[in-house]
Amino acid sequence: MQTTAALKAQIAAQVAGCDNLADLQAPAIGQTSRKNELLMFLKPEIFNNGNPAAIQNSLDMIFQKLQDFNAEVAGAVIVGGQALEAQKCMDRHYGTINVLSRTASQVLSAEDRQKIYDTLGVAAADYPLYGGHEFQASHPGFTPAKLDELWFTKKSMKIRSGFYVQAYELNGEKFILINGFHPAQLAHFTEPSHRIVLLLIHSDTNWATLRDELIGDTFPERAAAVSIRGTFYADPARYGFASVSIANNCVHLSAGPFEGMFEIGNFFGGLMNIDVKSTQPLIVRQMIAAGITADQAWKAIDNPTVTADGKTKDLYSLTEHKDTAPSIAIYQSSL
């Protein structure tokens, strides 16, 4: 494992020229005695400003925060937008958001369709439905940026997690967009000139602390002042930004242990051809040690519906911000 200074220097030196992958530190998946294993990535906006001093300030701050919160970097890989696009990593990462953007008109149930029309107060006969990508395909003049601009002319309505809608009328055409923001969201990562930096994190710090105080709220203006997002928000110019908002919140960290399990496989497995079934993530090793069969352990990645403490939800949501051991107990109690 290389020093923090050496790793930061490698990122700064190589990130601008990495079109595919740069494996700076091989990810030590599952190889830890610490209690939590997470996936973190640094988003393209950190590296897009072309200001080496600002990029260095960002790296210095982020790695200092990791040290402050006892979060060990156990793997580091630079990934170019072309690689993310080729392997469809971001499509899988965004899950339901992506599926609805690409196929809403085909996959929505009659019940969901009616809920959309009721929520928006419009008639089905007057307003056909389009996912964001579907609208682009049928309206070739709409780039991701132009569609994003249209989407944000009105406040969207939330049907449920990952499912946002709004009705529009443009040049005499009426229509409903579903997740119309997503093509631009996706393009931000898959644009060939953009890069992210994947970090495998091992830590004994509580998951909730890492999410709330290390990373900070999704909306940087609400983030803890000590957090990475809070620090970016408080002094954007130091890091090369005019301002910092949810649109450029700079970092991602797995929301919970089972989501982290999925993300490790999606990114490290998908991009680096790592067989995560043989190079098992920490949570898989611990599930098997707790008496869960390997088959049952891997079924958890499908995000089944489970019940715990009187709540019935999908496994990822029910274990957000929880440490690995209690999350395993929740899953095991449902088997």
Roles of regions detected by a PLM:
Residues M1-L335:
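Non-catalytic terminal and connector segments of soluble metabolic enzymes
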